[in-house]
């Protein structure tokens, strides 16, 4: 089949590109570490190199990019869409790349900004594309509900009639990585390997009693900074083995996220997670502890559905 367009999830540290044909079928995928930070000042050259070295791709293919590529650290700043915009309208707001060569159709997906009545402001870039993909992959039932998009910055989103009505971001993955690499907990937490996009822990942590203990402790509602120091106190007094600290801290952080954000979902509906299997499993463990229904949606399939739907609609330059 002949390639019709390229979709790129261009994050802070990583980039994943999909080559797709006119029927929406995936022809090939590529992933690398040419994220927004690594590409500073050379985004155009990086994209042209990606296309030039990709069999089946041609320079004139339309390219749709989402994520931090449209942020202040990205290629060009694309203004956020505001909360009242319907997700289904996302393709109508694609922004052309200002310095694209003549004849090239390169576009960046805008991020999302939500301002609450009490003055709280939250934003996202990239996750709006996945939510758009969920609407197209799942159909009308996806227009209402609670979604979790875990990662370095975990997003909890409430949709109503296809519009984002609530958005809460948690620095769960970033905090775990910082605690594991720096400070007084680092030596204990580094005794167990991390994995996953957010580095939260290996798959077996789901069945680890220390992880579940951390989730349960967070459910009690302690001040998180105090609970985190409690991990150090347990290790230095011998109440906790050093190798258990990473699982316990992982449970505290994800558990604190759940303790606050689960209110976005009603008791009679599932919490839907869009993410890789390792992180989804951690969130599923939290859902079980809180007595919540839970559904896992494959992030890769969601992303491909988004690219297909965007390419199928008219692109307004």
Question: Language-model features: where?
Answer:
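Short acidic-glycine loop/turn motifs at beta-strand connectors
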Residues: 21-25, 102, 158-163
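N-terminal phosphate-binding loop and adjacent alpha-helix
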Residues: 26-61, 70-77, 188
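ATP-binding/phosphotransfer module of carbohydrate and carboxylate kinases, centering on a glycine-rich
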Residues: 15, 20, 184-187, 191-317
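Glycine-rich beta-strand-to-loop/alpha-helix junction loops that act as flexible
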Residues: 66-69, 150-153, 273-277
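Short glycine-rich, Thr/Ser-proximal phosphate-binding strand/loop in the N-terminal lobe
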Residues: 4-42, 297
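Glycine-rich phosphate-binding loop plus the immediately following alpha-helix
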Residues: 113-217
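Short glycine-aspartate micro-motif
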Residues: 5-9, 62-64, 145-149, 272-273
